[in-house]
């Protein structure tokens, strides 16, 4: 797999469009940090660790729906392995004029765009969620 973050985001997007209650993904610290931000912002209901049949750690994400519509309307990967995009805290673009969030990988860990501006920390723009 060349881009595990895109795989995780695609699993979330596909599961929400298929109206599934939850989805699983191989576990990593980065995926767990992304899930923590999505939960804090109200885009997913919950996440927890699990194991698959082979005994490997997985991340089980419970999706959230509002009036039977997915809470995640859109989810796009911005920085890819072939084209990394870095922004200073002043240059981080707003998603839908502030209605969505950007997840940024900084030297202080993953943060949403508003936290980056508040803490004056730039970094790699991972994805946009709305």
UniProtKB/Swiss-Prot annotation:
GO terms for biological process: translation. SUPFAM superfamilies: Ribosomal protein S8 (SSF56047). Keywords: Ribonucleoprotein, Ribosomal protein, RNA-binding, rRNA-binding. GO terms for molecular function: rRNA binding; structural constituent of ribosome. One of its GO terms (cellular component) is ribosome. Transmembrane segments: none annotated. InterPro entries: Ribosomal_uS8, Ribosomal_uS8_sf. Disulfide bonds: none annotated. Belongs to the universal ribosomal protein uS8 family. Part of the 30S ribosomal subunit. Contacts proteins S5 and S12. One of the primary rRNA binding proteins, it binds directly to 16S rRNA central domain where it helps coordinate assembly of the platform of the 30S subunit. This is Small ribosomal subunit protein uS8. It comes from Opitutus terrae (strain DSM 11246 / JCM 15787 / PB90-1). The gene is rpsH.
